[in-house]
Curated annotation (Swiss-Prot):
<keyword id="KW-0378">Hydrolase</keyword>
<comment type="similarity">
    <text>Belongs to the Nudix hydrolase family. RppH subfamily.</text>
</comment>
<comment type="function">
    <text>Accelerates the degradation of transcripts by removing pyrophosphate from the 5'-end of triphosphorylated RNA, leading to a more labile monophosphorylated state that can stimulate subsequent ribonuclease cleavage.</text>
</comment>
<feature type="short sequence motif" description="Nudix box">
    <location>
        <begin position="38"/>
        <end position="59"/>
    </location>
</feature>
<dbReference type="InterPro" id="IPR022927">
    <property type="entry name" value="RppH"/>
</dbReference>
<feature type="domain" description="Nudix hydrolase">
    <location>
        <begin position="6"/>
        <end position="148"/>
    </location>
</feature>
<dbReference type="InterPro" id="IPR015797">
    <property type="entry name" value="NUDIX_hydrolase-like_dom_sf"/>
</dbReference>
<dbReference type="InterPro" id="IPR020476">
    <property type="entry name" value="Nudix_hydrolase"/>
</dbReference>
<dbReference type="InterPro" id="IPR020084">
    <property type="entry name" value="NUDIX_hydrolase_CS"/>
</dbReference>
<dbReference type="GO" id="GO:0016462">
    <property type="term" value="F:pyrophosphatase activity"/>
</dbReference>
<dbReference type="Pfam" id="PF00293">
    <property type="entry name" value="NUDIX"/>
</dbReference>
<dbReference type="InterPro" id="IPR000086">
    <property type="entry name" value="NUDIX_hydrolase_dom"/>
</dbReference>
<protein>
    <recommendedName>
        <fullName>RNA pyrophosphohydrolase</fullName>
        <ecNumber>3.6.1.-</ecNumber>
    </recommendedName>
</protein>
Length: 155
């Protein structure tokens, strides 16, 4: 779903383990790492999109996690000109609703091959603030906003 301004509606997931470390996934066939994320389909709520993406990208089901919080606002980022899609509808970036989840099931339930088109090749747990400086540069500010917003929910 791309809005009139050219931003694609998207959800992003910060998944915590019991030690409050976060899931960090390496994009398939790439060297870049990121949080699970994906588009919101027409007629889908952000919560529904989050659960769908959670299963598609890392194999987890709603019963495997607890939703701790979500951002009130949509956080936007622009993509570099070289990545802007030139055919209609033109997409200049993403607007994201972020979700903070706590893993309730064993980490062995994480399955990067739950989908026919896996998003990630590899994953690991990293410290809470690590992703801000290790995600692709044009996503750093939205990562900073989301992690800062969620910090108050972490015990």
């Amino acid at each position: 779903m791309i809005d009139k301004s050219g931003y694609r509606a998207n959800v992003a997931i910060v998944l915590l383990n019991k030690q409050n470390r976060v899931f960090w996934g390496q994009r398939r066939n790439r060297t870049s790492w990121q949080f699970p994320q994906g588009g919101v389909a027409t007629g889908e709520t952000p919560l529904q999109a989050m659960y769908r993406e959670l299963h598609e990208e890392i194999g987890l089901r709603p019963q495997d996690v607890e939703v701790i919080a979500s951002t009130r606002d949509w956080y936007k980022y622009d993509i570099p000109d070289s990545l802007v899609r030139t055919k209609e509808p033109i997409c200049i970036g993403q607007k994201q609703k972020w979700f903070l989840l706590k893993l309730k099931s064993p980490e062995s339930y994480i399955d990067l091959d739950a989908n026919d088109s896996p998003e990630f090749d590899n994953w690991r747990w990293v410290s809470y603030w690590y992703p801000i400086n290790h995600v692709v540069y044009f996503k750093q500010e939205v990562y900073r906003k989301a992690l800062t917003y969620f910090k108050e929910y972490i015990a």
